Amino acid sequence: MGIHGLAKLIADVAPSAIRENDIKSYFGRKVAIDASMSIYQFLIAVRQGGDVLQNEEGETTSLMGMFYRTIRMENGIKPVYVFDGKPPQLKSGELAKRSERRAEAEKQLQQAQEAGMEEEVEKFTKRLVKVTKQHNDECKHLLSLMGIPYLDAPSEAEASCAALAKAGKVYAAATEDMDCLTFGSPVLMRHLTASEAKKLPIQEFHLSRVLQELGLNQEQFVDLCILLGSDYCESIRGIGAKRAVDLIQKHKSIEEIVRRLDPSKYPVPENWLHKEAQQLFLEPEVVDPESVELKWSEPNEEELVKFMCGEKQFSEERIRSGVKRLSKSRQGSTQGRLDDFFKVTGSLSSAKRKEPEPKGPAKKKAKTGGAGKFRRGK
């Protein structure tokens, strides 16, 4: 879910924080991508007029989505995929709710199938989609053959994407989860891995502008996000987005808001874990950006054909064609961006951003199969 209603709220009260760009605008940019979110998008992709996300046996697969969306970034984008680690304990309540919703969707799917309601069948089938360890492992193997770096986050992928962006290792974090801003990513990109059929422009959300327009610091913004509703604790019933903004701007903290609220009108949840949620957002368990070395290498064409065609039964012609496009883009992206060498003034994206040094668990290193070093494609 991320943060409930945050994208709409920013569009309403801080529209200058949002930019829309064509993918060609990102030539030479390094971007940290939430891998699990991308895989989920590939698994629920609607295949209109073609079966590009299915193999010759008709099996839906995330591999072709990962292959083609990564190649789609042939305008010189340098992606690094970040995979989820162990979910934080605070998320257990949200995960339990998702299991309940999945069980209910299974019942509704069966009823829709018996009634022959095709649209309802598709809707409830999507609700049952879940990214598995096998999906992750196969996509990691594919990325290594493509020469694309990836890493395993110790916990939430979007938090580690944000850490990489804060440290300047990448230009932005790419995910659909708005809590990437709550974790402190200076720039959040949405729709980067969305289906081409949707024709969605890439949206950029700039945290510094959000804070400036709202008149908040990062700690107050975190409190606002908790009031809106997150994956990690309940929100206060009866407080909508506009009211939440007004309250945090006036009282500056959740603690002061709670002290002044009428409990009969706005009852605070019992055993409310807002302090734990604050700490999780401000000091998340993330990769240590300084230990991460990002390298992109040439794709291994023959091993890709062996894996994608021999094992997974995809068209060899499509795979070899894709490899050629990937190699061509790799050569182009090595030229670099002009603003990597010259400071560009008056540009939102080129503004220097000073972020606080990560503390405590934020310094934890990436989990990379026990090797202790960042794994990269060969």
UniProtKB/Swiss-Prot annotation:
Structure-specific nuclease with 5'-flap endonuclease and 5'-3' exonuclease activities involved in DNA replication and repair. During DNA replication, cleaves the 5'-overhanging flap structure that is generated by displacement synthesis when DNA polymerase encounters the 5'-end of a downstream Okazaki fragment. It enters the flap from the 5'-end and then tracks to cleave the flap base, leaving a nick for ligation. Also involved in the long patch base excision repair (LP-BER) pathway, by cleaving within the apurinic/apyrimidinic (AP) site-terminated flap. One of its GO terms (biological process) is DNA replication, removal of RNA primer. Acetylated by EP300. Acetylation inhibits both endonuclease and exonuclease activity. Acetylation also reduces DNA-binding activity but does not affect interaction with PCNA or EP300. Phosphorylation upon DNA damage induces relocalization to the nuclear plasma. Phosphorylation at Ser-185 by CDK2 occurs during late S-phase and results in dissociation from PCNA. The modification Phosphothreonine is found at T334. Interacts with PCNA. Three molecules of FEN1 bind to one PCNA trimer with each molecule binding to one PCNA monomer. PCNA stimulates the nuclease activity without altering cleavage specificity. The C-terminal domain binds EP300; can bind simultaneously to both PCNA and EP300. Interacts with DDX11; this interaction is direct and increases flap endonuclease activity of FEN1. Interacts with WDR4; regulating its endonuclease activity. Interacts with POLB. Gene3D superfamilies: 5' to 3' exonuclease, C-terminal subdomain, 5'-nuclease. It comes from Mus musculus (Mouse). Mg(2+) 1 binds at D34, D84, E156, E158. This is Flap endonuclease 1. Pfam families: XPG_I, XPG_N.
